[in-house]
Amino acid sequence: MANRFRSGISFFKTIAVTDSVSSVRSKSLFPALRTYATASAQTTANVKVPIALVGENGNFASWLYIAAVKMNSLEKIETDLSEMIEAMKTAPIFAQFTKDPSVPRGTRLAAIRDACDQAKFAEPTKNFLSLLAENGKLKNLDAIVKKFMQLTNAHRGDVKVLVTTVIPLPPAEEKELTETLQEIIGAGKKITVEQKIDPSIYGGLIVEFQQKVLDMSIRTRAQQMERLLREPVDFNNL
């Protein structure tokens, strides 16, 4: 495992320090989100998200982050959202009710606002959840919150790295990986490595952090080889 990891170090560094990982940014924000964001457009002009997120969920998370920073409510909103996610896990009927498209928008909105009041959520949290409820986006809440947590972690200098392997990394190899990541990401950042076991990758590893993915799995290499072998060969050009 260590040899497979070391053989990919130089390639890993190349990928990690560039923007070569494919990403597509949405050309337009959800209209209601734009309205939410422009409420304080002049005061948020100097706030930048610590990492660029893509997709509709990333846009929601980014605008909430900007609003939270300007209102000095980042920690409170983070806590509120974590509590809401936990509440939906422990009360699945309520969660299903808030996401059910057949529930009238006004009823769904009233339920969310009442829940926010009872939980004593901050006003920005309440407004944001109400926005999602009004536009039928509560079904995306878990994904949005995960994106938002990426931003808050980056804001604090924390970098979460997900490493997928067939078997758990031995301590020595995890230490080597962490040291390599620290060198790439830079001093002053706190790196947290989370390991995920997935036998379907056959071997090697997949490293994901800060919107970057380095796939050094045997599964992917085998798929690439299969595609290469399936391509027709033009013997005239040999």
From Swiss-Prot:
Assembly, per entry: F-type ATPases have 2 components, CF(1) - the catalytic core - and CF(0) - the membrane proton channel. CF(1) has five subunits: alpha(3), beta(3), gamma(1), delta(1), epsilon(1). CF(0) has three main subunits: a, b and c.
Record-listed Phosphothreonine modification sites: 90
InterPro entries the record matches: ATP_synth_OSCP/delta_N_sf (IPR026015), ATPase_OSCP/dsu (IPR000711)
Cellular compartment(s): Mitochondrion; Mitochondrion inner membrane
The organism of origin for this protein: Arabidopsis thaliana (Mouse-ear cress)
Family statement: Belongs to the ATPase delta chain family.
Keyword Repeat: no
Entry GO terms, CC: chloroplast; mitochondrial inner membrane; mitochondrion; plastid
Keywords: ATP synthesis, Hydrogen ion transport, Ion transport, Membrane, Mitochondrion, Mitochondrion inner membrane, Phosphoprotein, Transit peptide, Transport
Transmembrane segments: none
Lineage of source species: Eukaryota, Viridiplantae, Streptophyta, Embryophyta, Tracheophyta
Keyword Secreted: no
Pfam families referenced in this protein's UniProt entry, alphabetically: OSCP
One Gene Ontology MF term: cobalt ion binding
Name assigned to this protein: ATP synthase subunit O, mitochondrial
Record's function text: Mitochondrial membrane ATP synthase (F(1)F(0) ATP synthase or Complex V) produces ATP from ADP in the presence of a proton gradient across the membrane which is generated by electron transport complexes of the respiratory chain. F-type ATPases consist of two structural domains, F(1) - containing the extramembraneous catalytic core and F(0) - containing the membrane proton channel, linked together by a central stalk and a peripheral stalk. During catalysis, ATP synthesis in the catalytic domain of F(1) is coupled via a rotary mechanism of the central stalk subunits to proton translocation.
Domain of life: Eukaryota
Principal cellular location given in the protein's record: mitochondrion
Record: transit peptide: 1-36
Family matches, as PANTHER family: ATP SYNTHASE DELTA CHAIN (PTHR11910)
